[in-house]
Amino acid sequence: ASNPGLQRALYAIRIGLRSEGVREWNYSVGLHVPGGMNDRELLAAADLACKAQVWDRCINTSERTREAIDWKQRFPMPFHDAVIAKANSIGLDPAYVYGLIRQESRFIMDARSHVGASGLMQVMPATAKWTARKIGMTDFQPQMINDRDVNITIGTSYLKLALDDFEGSMAMAAAGYNAGPGRPRNWRNGPVLEGAIWAENVPFTETRDYVKKVLSNTTNYAAMITGRPQSLKARLGTVGPKVTTAEYNPDLP
């Protein structure tokens, strides 16, 4: 914990110099000694980041351990009350929300993507506007998406609308969240497959990787929340052509 490089890194991140801080952190963790830190040092460094609520460094540092594994560091649950309450209020599995946020932003509240998505749940401006209208958030302004609770409300509401549109398939809804809903609607039109096999056949590399990571994260979070082992296979379910006659929501962005 007394490592000056790590302290400098956390200070830089705290005052808004995120990329410099991350560079300093990564250097301190991995490059200043041959082979990098050992497991005990990595867990101590991750703990330092967790305590400072720098969740991306907490997760990424803890994931570097080779033998000792700290699941709470690898799968933290920040903003616990806000996420659980919102997910439960709209009938969404909180583990799924956490699994998605971990992949989208690593819990960095002011994360911005190169395509303009914002916040914890990386919501696009047009999607935010559409979702706000859909859920009756009449006072919504574009800049509000950077507010933590608004971001969680909009992101979870959109995810639930996508999940309902895909008849509860977490794999397809995750693909839709990443690539837009039109693509997974087409990708499901082959034979009925186990979700894991379907995910392996998603033609976009980024979306394929995303779906697998979100569902794997979700399974780990569900195990932590329930205190019971979980099945990734059960969570992925099966994916195949639409069996109900209900129409897709044509304006789902």
Give the location of each predicted region.
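Catalytic glycan-binding domains that act on GlcNAc-containing polysaccharides
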Residues: 1, 5-8, 15-253
